[in-house]
């Protein structure tokens, strides 16, 4: 792990009103995620596709704390009703960019994007080794993702909470998406 890149990402992401948590392993990442969920009194949580080692720990910890966990695959007909009552979404980043503070997520299923876009709280997990320095470095993995998934590729750049300033020219967070975003970086 390059500590300088982690610090640069943290500083930039926090300047965008994102919250960064540094942890040392998957178990600690799941504990941190559940701690955030408890703080937000989340009872219903949606998750996107997550690595098996993290997903298993998260499922166990959510069950221990009485939280309902919606897991993919999602059935499109049920999505609007299901996401109406979800308080938080948990996703996995392909990588993040230290220079911009943006988290980058790849999906090939439109419904998985809802996990990051609809709940009031979004928690994203990423490995410290998946941090890159510059936006220019993002071009190659994005190009490869589109090449490998030409029919239905989605790339999302997530730079903190949703924001708008079209109401009386005042910045308001969380109007069109999450009001709070957390990036949990696993060393």
Q: What spans do the regions from the language model cover?
A:
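The feature marks the mature, well-folded catalytic cores of soluble enzymes
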Residues: 1-187
């Amino acid at each position: 792990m390059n500590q300088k890149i982690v610090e640069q990402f943290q500083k930039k992401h926090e300047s965008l009103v994102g919250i960064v948590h540094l942890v040392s392993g998957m178990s600690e990442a799941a504990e941190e995620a559940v701690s955030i969920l408890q703080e937000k009194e989340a009872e219903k949580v949606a998750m996107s596709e997550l690595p098996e080692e993290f997903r298993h720990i998260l499922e166990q910890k959510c069950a221990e704390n009485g939280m309902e966990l919606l897991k993919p695959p999602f059935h499109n007909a049920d999505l609007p009703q299901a996401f109406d009552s979800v308080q938080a979404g948990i996703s996995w980043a392909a990588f993040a960019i230290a220079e911009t503070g943006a988290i980058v997520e790849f999906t090939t299923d439109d419904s998985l994007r809802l996990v990051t876009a609809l709940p009031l709280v979004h928690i994203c997990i990423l490995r410290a080794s998946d941090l890159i320095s510059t936006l220019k470095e993002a071009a190659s993995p994005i190009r490869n993702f589109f090449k490998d998934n030409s029919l239905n590729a989605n790339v999302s750049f997530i730079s903190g909470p949703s924001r708008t300033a079209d109401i009386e020219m005042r910045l308001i967070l969380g109007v069109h998406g999450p009001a709070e975003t957390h990036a949990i970086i696993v060393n």
